[in-house]
């Protein structure tokens, strides 16, 4: 050791990999890092502080700084600027609170936590500032909207590219305008970045925002819709269309999060308002519940079907897993054939995105099989007079499946035909909004109920945690009621060479024939012969009828439970508005002051927790 030779660690130069590892250890446990450093050396904690002080302040809203961050992100990983990049967007609950923030660049104070851009504080008096907010119509932000940028390659963490404060009443047009502003910053540049996908979950607001985005850029002439066609195998129906969006001179596709789709399809199956009629077979919740009664052989847990967490990724994965599929084949009666087919078809649809060891030709077959199966299902219901709103998946699920199908096909077309360097591998599981949920989870591990100012403090410090997650190989598949499970960074079984081989148009037409034959064969097993029925389903008069109590939407945040901090702040706000001078006793006024001090202490505690974690960017 150096100390044995009378030497210290001053002035030593450490390899970047060692520096990064020390940084990660410091984030996890400062005490453990101090012990490690006393034996093996490493930067001081103050050195990491100095490195962090050189990092630019992260700002809210869409600004030109987003391009600089994205460019530096690509440079840090040696990634070419013309390489494909993926954007993910999602939102989560935010603690409604206004906090002061000093900007050292402009040398001004701003109020953080209001919907939209930060508001400059121009009054010294709190009453005058409150009046300013009332006059301008500002409201507190109740939701955080966050965009990530992803280099879609193995073991590369995402980058938080932008955040914005919104409210639950923010409409889809406003969300679309934010997306358009970000695309303009990144793509309308002298050296534009190559965005190939923008992904989100399947919430209604997100799907509507994508539609508004397309309508906006097309109406202004900054974008156009390109349509690729695949010949329909039945020879009678119109060709399959794959829409692409050319915006700011580049082509991208709109996709949905595949894991969100899997949870939506599970929730549809568990809905008491629906019973899936698949020819001679009916599929419903009780069939899945019966599987869990076989405790000796069931691949499912009781919590997967009873008092279930609708956001549990692992439970949805277990339902559509090969183990559950094998159980339905080997241990259930033939009357459950509909359940087997449902799990097979739509489980394969998600696997087309999530599988790490299949070729793109197999993925094409899997997504097209799901499309043809769904179209034939609609045709059967129409022919039999069954209303879709009771015997088919929900409209939301139907739309999400269509977007998944066209999204994967669109990614294949873009990688094959539109990239300057067509040798870039396509890894579909890196596209979507899973990285956004991962960022939200890391934030809540630091502060369970954060304000917008907390977000601005945390975002620059998440890089090390994301890097550590990308190197982690530990996943708890059997864990129950565990919420989100993030696997987009797992690539161990991925053969990179197979992801650079894309089928030609002629091959895709042939694969469509294979997928169509498989879909028709599955329907023949179910007792329906679709050979003489057009696969383009007709609309039904009853489609517009709403079914009560059928709320399969995933557009809710599992973290919105009221925390002590939120409850305390809400109570203080109500009391401040209802306070009338002279109407409150000295004791009550003293109690209110103590509650205010407690709220301030909670805020300071959260800030000190951030400092203890020492999540500094070692760049």
Label for each model-derived stretch:
Residues 1-21:
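Basic, short loop/linker segments at the boundary and entry of helix-turn-helix/winged-helix-like folds
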Residues 5-11, 28-129, 205-210, 215-232:
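Electropositive nucleic-acid engagement tracts
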Residues 8-9, 21-23, 32-34, 69-75, ...:
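Eukaryotic intrinsically disordered and solvent-exposed regulatory patches
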Residues 26-38, 191-195, 275:
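Short, charged amphipathic recognition helices of the HTH superfamily
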Residues 30, 42, 80-83, 143, ...:
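Short, well-ordered loop/turn elements at secondary-structure boundaries
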Residues 34-35, 86-88, 93, 148-150, ...:
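Beta-strand cores of modular interaction/reader domains in eukaryotic scaffold and signaling proteins
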Residues 86, 118-156:
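Active-site cores of enzymes that catalyze phosphoryl transfer or operate on phosphate-rich substrates
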Residues 136, 151-153, 157, 161, ...:
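Non-catalytic regulatory appendages
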């Amino acid at each position: 050791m150096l100390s044995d030779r009378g030497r210290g660690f001053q002035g030593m130069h450490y390899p970047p990999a060692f520096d990064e590892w020390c940084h990660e250890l410091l984030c996890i446990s400062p005490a453990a890092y101090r012990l490690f450093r006393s034996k093996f050396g490493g930067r001081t904690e103050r050195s990491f502080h100095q490195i962090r002080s050189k990092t630019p302040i992260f700002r809210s809203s869409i600004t030109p700084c987003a391009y600089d961050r994205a460019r530096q992100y690509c440079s840090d990983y040696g990634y070419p600027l013309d390489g494909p990049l993926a954007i993910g967007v999602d939102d989560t609950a935010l603690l409604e609170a206004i906090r002061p923030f000093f900007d050292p660049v402009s040398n001004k104070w701003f109020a953080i936590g209001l919907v939209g851009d930060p508001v400059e504080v121009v009054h010294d008096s709190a009453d005058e500032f409150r009046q300013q907010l009332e006059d301008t119509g500002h409201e507190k932000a109740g939701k955080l909207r966050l965009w990530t940028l992803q280099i879609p390659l193995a073991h590369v963490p995402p980058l938080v590219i932008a955040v914005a404060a919104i409210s639950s009443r923010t409409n889809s047009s406003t969300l679309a305008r934010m997306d358009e502003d970000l695309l303009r910053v990144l793509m309308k540049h002298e050296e534009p970045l190559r965005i190939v996908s923008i992904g989100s979950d399947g919430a209604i607001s997100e799907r509507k925002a994508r539609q508004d985005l397309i309508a906006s850029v097309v109406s202004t002439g900054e974008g156009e819709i390109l349509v690729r066609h695949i010949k329909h195998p039945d020879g009678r129906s119109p060709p399959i269309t794959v829409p692409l969006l050319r915006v700011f001179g580049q082509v991208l596709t709109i996709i949905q999060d595949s894991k969100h789709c899997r949870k939506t399809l599970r929730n549809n199956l568990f809905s008491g308002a629906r019973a899936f009629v698949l020819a001679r077979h009916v599929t419903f919740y009780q069939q899945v519940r019966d599987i869990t009664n076989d405790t000796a052989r069931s691949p499912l847990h009781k919590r997967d079907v009873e008092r279930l967490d609708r956001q549990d990724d692992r439970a949805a994965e277990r339902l559509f897993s090969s183990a559950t599929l094998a159980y339905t084949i080997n241990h259930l009666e033939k009357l459950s054939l509909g359940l087997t087919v449902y799990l097979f078809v739509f489980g394969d649809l998600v696997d087309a995105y999530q599988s790490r060891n299949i070729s793109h030709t197999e993925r094409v077959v899997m997504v097209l099989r799901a499309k043809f199966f769904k179209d034939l299902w609609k045709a059967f219901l129409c022919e039999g007079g069954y209303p879709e709103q009771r015997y088919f998946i929900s409209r939301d699920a139907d739309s999400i499946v269509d977007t998944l199908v066209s999204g994967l096909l669109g990614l294949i077309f873009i990688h094959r035909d539109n990239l300057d360097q067509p040798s870039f591998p396509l890894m579909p599981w890196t596209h979507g909004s899973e990285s956004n949920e991962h960022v939200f989870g890391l934030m809540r591990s630091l502060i369970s109920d954060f304000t917008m100012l907390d977000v601005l403090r945390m975002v620059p410090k998440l890089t090390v945690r994301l890097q550590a997650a990308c190197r982690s190989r530990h996943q708890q598949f059997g864990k129950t009621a565990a919420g989100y499970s993030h696997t987009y960074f797992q690539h161990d079984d991925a053969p990179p060479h197979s992801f650079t081989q894309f089928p030609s148009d002629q091959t895709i037409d042939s694969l469509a024939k294979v997928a169509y034959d498989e879909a028709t064969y599955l329907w023949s097993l179910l007792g329906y012969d679709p050979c003489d029925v057009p696969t383009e389903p007709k609309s039904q008069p009853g489609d517009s009828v709403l079914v009560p109590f059928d709320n399969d939407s995933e557009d809710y945040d599992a973290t919105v439970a009221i925390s002590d901090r939120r409850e305390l702040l809400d109570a203080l706000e109500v009391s401040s508005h209802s306070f009338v001078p002279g109407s409150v006793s000295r004791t009550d006024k003293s109690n209110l002051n103590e509650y205010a001090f407690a709220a301030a202490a909670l805020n300071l505690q959260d800030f000190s927790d951030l400092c203890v974690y020492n999540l500094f960017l070692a760049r």
